[in-house]
Amino acid sequence: MNYNILIISKLNILSSKNKISYKTSGVDIALGEKLVDHIKPLAKKTFRKEVLNEIGGFSSLFDIPKKYKKPVLVSSTDGVGTKIEIAEILDNHKTIGIDLVAMCVNDLITSGAEPLFFLDYLVTEKINLKKSKDIISGIAKGCKISNCSLIGGETAEHPRNFPKNKYDLAGFSVGVIEKEKIKKIKYDNNDILIGLKSSGLHSNGFSLIRELLKRKKIKLSSKVGSKSLGKILLEPTKIYVKEIKQLSKSIDIKSMAHITGGGLLGNLERIVCDNYNFELERNKLFFYHKKLFKLLMAKASLSNEEMLRTFNCGYGMVLVIRENELKKGTRILKKYNQSFQVIGRIKKSKDKSQIKII
């Protein structure tokens, strides 16, 4: 009996020394659970009445709003790219979650859809509780702004398989549109292009910016006007959900382009139609955030074409509307303090469709 106990004791000592647990492998389940406890009340504040279950289940349930007779679901997914690196350098992660939501829901609303719910994916080498809380808090804030329920997500630790202290984000949004309201793009001669002011660079062009900071040894603390460059770069992406929703009720928005990767030109090309040209006014390009764009253009030695295909050039969303609806649209946008410019016109063409700068 005593011998057996001794053997077991020795085995326990040996096993404790050589024990391989999830935690020693780099995954801290207890820390993950603490993060979930923090997320639950944040998510609950974003819940619409259509949410049918709580955070923490294996899946999330959402009832399609009753007002839709023939609902069509609309989905989008995106990330925030290397803007995360700027957040890392400045150790400020409070708004990067807003960027994540914005990148997804702004894509969603270009089809005329109403955002319904959102899920996120956060992957990191090891959970940093404060950093993760800041990120998720930003996501919840973005969901509140867009009236979109944060109904689930995933936080993954990839020990020794992901750079130390680094993370990445992905978001997934789902919305709905009435089937009869799905439009095919159809333009008329002299329709106008309305550029809605961006809050800054939004979430694109940051790989170029990081390279620029490195090569030219530009400090994020350096001033651009009255603000530091770092603060300007981290300004969260503008969410246009409320403005677009109200505009759609009052005027006919013929098409929309969310100005993201590919810059102003690259995204406008996605809504060009056969037999119509887009004629952009040169003096309206870089109308907003002039000092920032002038700095980037000079320091990186970029041509106008490269700037237009890399950055949003001051416009986060471009709409095509009839000219006779401009006054009505202006009243709505003023109500939401949304600045804008008429940046061009649509002209009928017999040649191949193109974007011209005049």
Place the predicted regions along the sequence by residue:
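Glycine-/charge-enriched secondary-structure boundary and capping motifs
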Residues: 13-25, 35, 41, 131-149, ...
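Asparagine-rich low-complexity intrinsically disordered tracts
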Residues: 1-19, 67, 335
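Short, acidic (Asp/Glu-rich) active-site segment that either coordinates a divalent metal cofactor
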Residues: 77, 168, 181-229, 265
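Short, glycine-/Ser/Thr-/acidic-enriched flexible segments
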Residues: 66, 79, 174-178, 199-201, ...
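Generic hydrophobic alpha-helical membrane-span motif
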Residues: 34-36, 84, 118, 126, ...
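Glycine-rich phosphate/pyrophosphate-binding loop regions near the starts of catalytic domains
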Residues: 41-199, 279
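Short loop/turn motifs at secondary-structure junctions
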Residues: 112-114, 208, 252, 339
